Amino acid sequence: SLKDFKHFLDEAETRGMEVALDIAFQCAPDHPWVKKHPRWFCWRPDGTVQYAENPPKKYQDILPINFESDDWKNLWDELKSVFEYWIKQGVKVFRVDNPHTKSMEFWRWCILNIKAKHPEVIFLAEAFTRPKRKYFLAKSGFTHGYTYFTWRNTATELQQYVEELTQSESKEYFWPNFCPNTPDNLHADLQTGNRATFIGRYVLADTLTTNAG
């Protein structure tokens, strides 16, 4: 219940922790929006769902949102209200799922409006994508973004990557997050590694950035 959730927030705060909510803008087939606003979703010409694919995965059980719908203004307002609702409940951190597969114009508009009223709110982009796409998300307002740190393993790879993040133009707008919380996207060493492997990786992340974890 919402009462339980608020208690959870309070308990986390007493322990010096911040609760982050995962925001995934997509819907189940039985969501009220599907019947009330069918134009908000992606459909094939034959009327079937134009579901997302990330080979070999096929997400056939969820409906992707059409950010360029002819009713986009109402859609965008409704999506923004999701953030506003949880901010009202006391949430200040959002980890956004796959933002690079959504409209960049939406993120720029949404985050700008949210931060105008709530500048303390943090947006983390869970984006495993091309560097330019990551940087575009940062320029669109995301506070932090996922990186390729997990896949840089040799001393040379790590040095080159950290130099790229700290000595190139991107340092002006991209704040990297070095430890992703997506288990199925970990490097092979971490997928099969023991406790010492993870501790070593975290110490390295904590040494190289102010935003690890």
Predicted regions and their residues:
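Active-site beta->alpha N-cap acidic-glycine motif
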Residues: 23-25
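Alpha-amylase-like alpha-glycosidases and glucanotransferases acting on alpha-linked glucans and related
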Residues: 1-10, 14-17, 27-213
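Carbohydrate-binding surfaces in secreted/extracellular proteins
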Residues: 19-21
